């Protein structure tokens, strides 16, 4: 398991994937979240997508468009978070005004910390709920990563076994 601590600066550590969303719609992982300040935990997962948005620019002809230190091209992103309450499980915080980033509460609550949880979600179903007008068949999962909020608030999480499957 990888221990991830929130710090003063936000960061994302991501694995490039570039797989069709409908061909591999399931995301699985295990996590053990330490108690935190009672708000949403500052450590979570993030999934980046490209191609589903009808307004997306093509990058297919740019062979090296997703090499280097930056995140691969993406037009949509979903953060999978540990919410402030177990009752928020399955809740979606709508995208920002730009329509790119949304937040999905996978699990939550202080009462559920200090234990390992195995999670499996259908990211195609979550994507379709957030952006119903997008073309799911054209959407690609560009990366999966671990992110921190960078708020400086105390909060550690152990994350293991991140896997995209069909």
List each language-model region with its residue ranges.
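Short carbohydrate-recognition loop motifs
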Residues: 1-12
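Extracellular/lumenal carbohydrate-interaction signature centered on repeated Trp-anchored short motifs
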Residues: 16-27, 110-113, 137-138
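Extracellular beta-strand ligand-recognition surfaces/modules
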Residues: 43-45, 97-109, 113-156
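Extracellular beta-strand elements of beta-rich domains used
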Residues: 144, 160-164
């Amino acid at each position: 398991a990888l221990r991830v601590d929130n710090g003063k600066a936000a960061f994302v550590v991501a694995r490039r994937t570039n797989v069709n969303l409908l061909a591999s719609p399931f995301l699985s992982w295990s996590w053990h979240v330490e108690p935190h300040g009672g708000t949403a935990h500052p450590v979570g997962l993030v999934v980046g997508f490209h191609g589903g948005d009808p307004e997306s620019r093509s990058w297919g002809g740019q062979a090296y468009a997703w090499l280097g230190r930056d995140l691969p091209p993406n037009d949509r992103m979903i953060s999978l978070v540990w919410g402030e309450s177990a009752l928020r499980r399955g809740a979606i915080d709508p995208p920002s005004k730009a329509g790119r980033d949304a937040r999905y509460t996978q699990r939550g609550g202080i009462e559920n910390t200090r234990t390992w949880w195995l999670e499996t979600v259908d990211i195609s179903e979550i994507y379709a709920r957030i952006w119903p007008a997008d073309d799911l068949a054209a959407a690609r999962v560009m990366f999966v990563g671990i992110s921190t909020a960078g708020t400086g608030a105390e909060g550690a999480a152990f994350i293991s076994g991140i896997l995209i499957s069909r």
